[in-house]
């Protein structure tokens, strides 16, 4: 108990020695019998346990659990778990444990571990000479081994050199049960050809779980922790389990918010040293990772790996819902929101919701009226960088992406993807309200407003509202009188691009829209639609004032104007 208070970690209690003090460190090297858990366990009465503070009780648990793990490690075989260990793992008090609960376990011997170290050869050939050679350097030339000694637990060291040798073996008592030193001894005497095996590349130790091979038993034992949850480390905060204590330590910083690694250049702090190292490259501007295909350089190897998929066309991240594949996991995560319909990011200004935070950030620029991205060629400004990038291609005229079906070229792969749906007829975006499907997500978004009746885009000039931003843009031209779309054939100008497109048909004489009922042909689909009403007799446009119905909206407008003229003349 005094050891715990003073910060000294006892490795074991001297069992079988009358009057033995708990401070005494007795190693398995000096025992003739097999090593049991009793040899490395410490008992407390209720009074003794209550004398310890919380930190000391935690230290006791840590020492006992670590000793048990190391005992299993050194044994190299499965050891049934003592009740004390089960009690400690469950966070119960250990003072009420019976003595037999710790000692009634099958003995654990080192001999089994040592014999299994190397398949080709046991330890009996070189054990004596290595022990003498290793500890002879400490000034214990008179160290004697019992005749016929074959394993560690059969060593009989002279009592007169016990205290000095004990001091020599232990560099510090503050390190809990330094089994790595013992393992190093085992490795040295187990096979004189250990260095040769490292150079030959032989890996005689194979994991039965995953078939992975190792050249050293120590490495195999460490690897086994991945498969054995008993040796795992669990986060008390969230219950997440890790194979390594160092990984748990890093994970805990998520809960504590601790960021111990600080950049001296800009003061930014990080949870992991590796993240800080990566961050520092920003200040140096170094880009050590180069693409062999196109020569592009990156400051992170992960960025280069992702970039290479552009050349290979690899898309390892697949959506289980619709089968669509992506070259980045982040793109898949973003895509999945389409299926859930979730829109967690809401604009405080207008209430509009988005499925991505970046989209909300971009949307906010609309309210601010800010257009930070300006074209150096023509001076046109945009509120999205992607829009500026797309716009620049107008000046270069480049069209990298070609449709194999019709040969049409496009500036963007996304535009080509959308275009291909014309040939395939694919309409992946479906309205949950009415079941109507669309080939573009933007069309679905615009369509949904029909059901809500929402018109978020309002003209500041006249107050007229629209359900789509392009309609507002087209409307604004009425106030400005601007007619930017000019016909190259006759010079006539229009305020909307769609009107120019319709006008061009008059020059080429195209009459693609034909009505089978009367064989009459039209250059525009809208004109054909109006013509059909003549044959059906349908009059969908009603005048509320007179109760009259018309087959064309223009006739209704004319009727309304006529009514207002008559009213003004009266």
UniProtKB/Swiss-Prot annotation:
Positions of the KRAB domain: 35-107
GO MF terms, alphabetically ordered: DNA-binding transcription factor activity, RNA polymerase II-specific; RNA polymerase II cis-regulatory region sequence-specific DNA binding; zinc ion binding
GO cellular component: nucleus
PTM annotation (N-acetylmethionine): residues: 1
GO biological process: regulation of DNA-templated transcription; substantia nigra development
InterPro entries per UniProt: KRAB, KRAB_dom_sf, Znf_C2H2_sf, Znf_C2H2_type
Gene3D superfamilies reported for this sequence: 6.10.140.140, Classic Zinc Finger
Zinc finger (C2H2-type): 205-227, 233-255, 261-283, 289-311, 317-339, 345-367, 373-395, 401-423, 429-451, 457-479, 485-507, 513-535
Keywords from the UniProt entry: Acetylation, DNA-binding, Metal-binding, Nucleus, Repeat, Transcription, Transcription regulation, Zinc, Zinc-finger
Disulfide bonds: none
TM annotation in the entry: none
Subcellular location: Nucleus
SMART domains in alphabetical order: KRAB (SM00349), ZnF_C2H2 (SM00355)
Free-text function comment from the UniProt entry: May be involved in transcriptional regulation.
The family this protein is said to belong to: Belongs to the krueppel C2H2-type zinc-finger protein family.
Listed name of the protein: Zinc finger protein 430
Upper classification of the organism: Eukaryota, Metazoa, Chordata, Craniata, Vertebrata
């Amino acid at each position: 108990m005094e050891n715990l208070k003073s910060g000294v970690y006892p490795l074991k209690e001297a069992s079988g020695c009358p009057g033995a003090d708990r401070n005494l460190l007795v190693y398995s090297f000096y025992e003739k019998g097999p090593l049991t858990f009793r040899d490395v366990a410490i008992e407390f009465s209720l009074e003794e346990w209550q004398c310890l503070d919380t930190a000391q009780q935690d230290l006791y648990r840590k020492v006992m659990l670590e000793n048990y793990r190391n005992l299993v490690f050194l044994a190299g075989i499965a050891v049934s778990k003592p009740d004390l260990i089960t009690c400690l793992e469950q966070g119960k008090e250990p003072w009420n444990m019976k003595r037999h609960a710790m000692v009634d376990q099958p003995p654990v011997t080192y001999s089994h571990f040592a014999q299994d170290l190397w398949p080709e050869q046991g330890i009996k050939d070189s054990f004596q000479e290595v022990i003498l050679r290793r500890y002879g350097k400490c000034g214990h030339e008179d160290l004697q081994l019992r005749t016929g000694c074959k394993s560690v637990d059969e060593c009989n060291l002279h009592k007169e050199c016990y205290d000095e040798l004990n001091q020599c073996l232990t560099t510090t008592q503050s390190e809990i049960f330094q089994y790595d030193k013992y393992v190093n001894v085992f490795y040295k005497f187990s096979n004189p050809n250990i260095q040769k095996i490292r150079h030959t590349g032989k890996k005689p130790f194979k994991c039965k779980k995953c078939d992975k091979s190792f050249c050293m038993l120590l490495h195999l034992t460490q690897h086994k922790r991945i498969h054995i949850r008993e040796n795992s480390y669990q986060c008390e905060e969230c219950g997440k389990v890790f194979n390594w204590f160092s990984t748990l330590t890093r994970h805990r910083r998520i809960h504590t918010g601790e960021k111990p690694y600080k950049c001296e250049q800009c003061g930014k702090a990080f949870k992991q040293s590796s993240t800080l190292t990566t961050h520092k490259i920003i200040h140096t501007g170094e880009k050590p990772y180069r693409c062999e295909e196109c020569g592009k350089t990156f400051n992170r190897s992960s960025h280069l790996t992702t970039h290479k998929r552009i050349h290979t066309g690899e898309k390892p991240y697949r959506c289980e819902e619709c089968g669509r594949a992506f070259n980045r996991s982040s793109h898949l995560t973003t895509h999945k929101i389409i299926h859930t319909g979730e829109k967690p990011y809401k604009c405080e200004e207008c209430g509009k919701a988005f499925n991505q935070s970046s989209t909300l950030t971009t949307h906010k620029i609309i309210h601010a009226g800010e257009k930070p991205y300006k074209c150096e060629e023509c001076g046109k400004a945009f509120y999205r960088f992607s829009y500026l990038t797309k716009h620049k291609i107008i000046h270069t005229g480049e069209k990298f992406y070609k449709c194999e079906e019709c040969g049409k070229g496009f500036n963007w792969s996304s535009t080509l993807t959308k275009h291909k749906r014309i040939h395939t007829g694919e309409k992946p975006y479906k309205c949950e309200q009415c079941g109507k499907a669309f080939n573009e997500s933007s069309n679905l978004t615009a369509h949904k407003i029909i059901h809500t009746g929402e018109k978020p885009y309002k003209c500041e000039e006249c107050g007229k509202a629209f359900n789509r931003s392009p309609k507002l843009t087209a409307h604004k031209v009425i106030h400005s009188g601007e007619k930017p779309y000019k016909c190259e054939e006759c010079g006539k100008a229009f305020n909307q691009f769609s009107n120019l497109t319709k006008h061009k048909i008059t020059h080429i004489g195209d009459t693609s829209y034909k009505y089978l009922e009367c064989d009459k042909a039209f250059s525009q689909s809208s004109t054909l639609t109006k013509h059909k009403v003549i044959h059906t007799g349908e009059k969908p446009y009603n005048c509320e004032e007179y109760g009259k119905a018309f087959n064309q909206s223009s006739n209704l407008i004319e009727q309304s104007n006529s009514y207002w003229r008559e009213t003004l003349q009266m």
